[in-house]
Amino acid sequence: IPKNLTRAQWFTIQHIQPSPLQXNKAMNGVNXYT
């Protein structure tokens, strides 16, 4: 976690702008439901 962010801010950023790995997991999850 960057020292200039609070845990809550970092948590929010991670959900607004997921890392590529998280995005890939999310896409795989969506694809599984389609």
From Swiss-Prot:
Record field: catalytic activity: an [RNA] containing cytidine + H2O = an [RNA]-3'-cytidine-3'-phosphate + a 5'-hydroxy-ribonucleotide-3'-[RNA]; an [RNA] containing uridine + H2O = an [RNA]-3'-uridine-3'-phosphate + a 5'-hydroxy-ribonucleotide-3'-[RNA]
Designated name of the protein: Ribonuclease PL1
Entries under Gene3D superfamilies matching the protein: Ribonuclease A-like domain
Location within or outside the cell: Lysosome
Swiss-Prot/TrEMBL keywords: Endonuclease, Glycoprotein, Hydrolase, Lyase, Lysosome, Nuclease
Assigned protein family: Belongs to the pancreatic ribonuclease family.
Organism in which the protein naturally occurs: Sus scrofa (Pig)
Keyword Iron-sulfur belongs to the record: no
InterPro entries, per database record: RNaseA-like_dom_sf
Cellular component annotations (GO), alphabetically ordered: lysosome
Glycosylation-annotated residues: 4
Active site annotation, chain numbering: 15 (proton acceptor)
Enzyme Commission number(s) from the entry: 4.6.1.18
GO molecular function: lyase activity; ribonuclease A activity
Top-level division of the source organism's lineage: Eukaryota
